[in-house]
């Protein structure tokens, strides 16, 4: 549970009013193994400047990275798409499984019950980030806010409460993979060189929202100026980037395949692919290997998180799902194993 909370604090769903900022993709593609490229966009590979020097230490130094050709989901994986996977395979997500008594002997049966992290909100600026979240028994991708909630009307929303192994299981069912951090960032930049945001260098404009993020002082109040107040949006509600990809900024955090280390590798053109598990390191929790998550979420505000930029990166524990964490997949051309798998 501590790992899950660490993931939540990386970037801070409670029920709230919602209005649509603009038309969304009416019917996102629901893929299956018979249509391996359905709902994906082909991205031609190349060399790009990965990372940033001016924002946060873990994002630099900028380096030249080469990525090959690949296909990537046009949108985040939706509830409808994940439901098809579960129906076909009988898969049970980590949030739906109880903790084992052998691994957690000091916890009671109730404390080991299936649960996940849900954003609780805050009526004031609490100095304790742990108060912003609740471990909710029964919360999972099927019930995003816990018992009593469901997916009715949310078929096109991004699936959440997904741990890294859940995302990998879905990807492998389709013969796909999770993107490396370099592939994800290359795709998010959409062909722009060195831009601060996925849409360019211009600061976010509340009159023409480009992404689902938090408007206002987090966690006290979200004005909902972007059309969605303190919650995820259906996929494709905001303009696509230069490669035709939606929601590469905000909405929900997205898993990558890479293990996390603060900072990037030394300069020089290198091939995409992150460090091995043995090299993973999070200074905040040494000894607990984590994966890189990218893109920020609907909880990212300028006063807290501010990670809805393509260079931004933060660690996520593999067993940590929450109400603001989802994913998308890639299909490489040709497919190949990535170091560190």
Sequence positions of predicted segments:
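Short, solvent-exposed alpha-helical surface patches in non-cytosolic proteins
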Residues: 74, 79-86, 163-169, 185
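C-terminal motif of bacterial Sec signal peptides marking the signal peptidase cleavage site
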Residues: 10-11
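Short capping motifs at secondary-structure boundaries
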Residues: 70, 85-94, 174
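Short proline/glycine-enriched turn/loop segments at secondary-structure junctions
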Residues: 281-285, 314-321
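Functional-site microenvironments in short loops/helix caps that host divalent-cation chemistry
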Residues: 18-23, 42-43, 49, 54, ...
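Short, structured beta-strand segments at or near domain termini in extracellular proteins/domains
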Residues: 323-337
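N-terminal pre-domain segments of enzymes
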Residues: 17-34
């Amino acid at each position: 549970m501590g790992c899950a909370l660490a993931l939540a604090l990386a970037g801070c769903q409670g029920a709230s009013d919602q209005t649509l900022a603009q038309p969304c993709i009416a019917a996102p593609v629901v893929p299956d193994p018979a249509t391996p490229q359905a709902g994906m966009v082909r991205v031609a590979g190349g060399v790009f400047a990965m990372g940033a020097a001016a924002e946060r230490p873990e994002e630099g130094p900028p380096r030249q990275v080469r990525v090959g050709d690949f296909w990537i989901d046009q949108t985040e994986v939706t509830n409808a798409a994940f439901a098809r996977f579960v129906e076909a395979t009988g898969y049970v997500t980590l949030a739906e499984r109880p903790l084992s008594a052998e691994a957690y002997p000091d916890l009671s049966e109730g404390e080991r019950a299936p649960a996940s992290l849900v954003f609780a909100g805050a009526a004031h600026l609490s100095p304790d980030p742990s108060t912003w979240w609740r471990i909710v028994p029964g919360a999972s991708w099927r019930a995003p806010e816990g018992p009593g909630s469901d997916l009715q009307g949310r078929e096109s929303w991004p699936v959440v409460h997904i741990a890294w192994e859940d995302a990998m299981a879905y990807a492998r069912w389709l013969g796909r993979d999770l993107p490396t951090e370099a592939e994800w960032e290359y795709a998010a930049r959409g062909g722009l060189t060195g831009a601060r945001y996925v849409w360019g260098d211009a600061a976010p404009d509340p009159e023409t929202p480009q992404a689902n993020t938090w408007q206002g002082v987090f966690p006290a109040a979200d004005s909902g100026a972007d059309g969605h107040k303190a919650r995820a949006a259906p996929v494709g509600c905001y303009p696509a980037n230069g490669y035709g990809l939606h929601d590469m900024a905000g909405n929900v955090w997205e898993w990558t395949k890479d293990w996390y280390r603060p900072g990037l590798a030394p300069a020089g053109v290198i091939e995409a692919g992150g460090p091995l598990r043995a090299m993973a390191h999070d200074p905040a929790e040494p000894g607990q290997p984590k994966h890189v998550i990218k893109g920020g979420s609907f909880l990212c505000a300028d006063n807290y998180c501010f990670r809805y930029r393509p260079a931004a990166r933060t660690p996520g524990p593999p067993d940590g799902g929450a109400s603001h964490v989802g994913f998308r997949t890639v299909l490489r051309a040709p497919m190949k194993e990535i170091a560190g798998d």
